[in-house]
Amino acid sequence: MSGLLVIGDVVTDVVALHDGPAATGTDTPADISLRPGGSGANTASWAARLGADTRLLARAGYDTGEWHVAQLAKAGVRPHLRIDPERPSAVVIAMVDSTGERSMLTNRGASGHIGVGDWTPDLLDGVGHLHLSAYTMFAEPGLELARLAMREAAERAIPISVDPASCGPLRAFGTERFLRETAPASVVIPNLDEALLLADAADPEASARTLSAHYGTAVVKLGAGGALLARDGRIVARAAAPPVDVVDSTGAGDAFAAGFLVASMAGSTPEEALRKGCEAGMAAVAQVGARPDPGNFTLLTPIAGLRRKLHH
């Protein structure tokens, strides 16, 4: 199986798990941990865990850049990270409630300044698939990088997939503009809200059909409802999500993308690839943090017994 190149972001995740609603103007008890994250880096880490030869192109800051490089290498990823000497790494504060749902406060930091200067054509040597996190595209330097990478991948007949990232920045960027800029991609992997927004549709099936008519293949992530896949305007596969006790939903979609892409690159059927994606996504939500092997990460507070405390 040829390699996977992911272009995306690395983020320092501050994950705060709290049992009840956050109290305004006073303290709310929480278990807080510091972990490596970022949509692109998460997908790359899960893909490496699943056996793919994976490299990541990203930009990190002067403060935690070397830590991010080390964490990616621990995960089996070949990191191609430029350390920005003037900017800190991106930071996300993820507030996770007792159901596993999260709300996020975001500072893009160095990740918002990745650009064509970070690119070299040899990044595509030995690569069988290019995957883009759309977070990279929402700032002009990253958009120029995405255009360049997709153009060079297309010239080498390397298939391209894109994850639309998040409804907020996607809406600000413009859905028609996004569809136009990502036209070289043959696979799009949105969650349900992103799919409905991009397709201007009312249900998952309609959105998948519409998006697959544009890209060729659309994979719509449905969370606990599993996933479905459409090709050329027709639903061709579905998969159910395995049951799991949800601890933290951060990174579930990134893990799904990794499972789906690695299985697809290995020649799996659409049904098998969806199932592998769902399995990876469920593995992600059963733990704290967005990457595999949480025991390898630096913790600010212990999380032993966390599930017991959350569901007490």
Language-model features: locations:
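Conserved phosphate-binding/catalytic loop of the ribokinase/pfkB sugar-kinase fold
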Residues: 94-139
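A short, aliphatic-rich alpha-helical micro-motif
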Residues: 123-125, 182, 212
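Glycine-rich phosphate/adenosyl-contacting loop at the front of the ribokinase-like
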Residues: 1-57, 66-69, 74, 92, ...
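Conserved beta-alpha-beta core of the PfkB/ribokinase-like small-molecule kinase fold
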Residues: 129-209, 225-227
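Hydrophobic beta-strand scaffold residues
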Residues: 54, 79, 160-161, 218
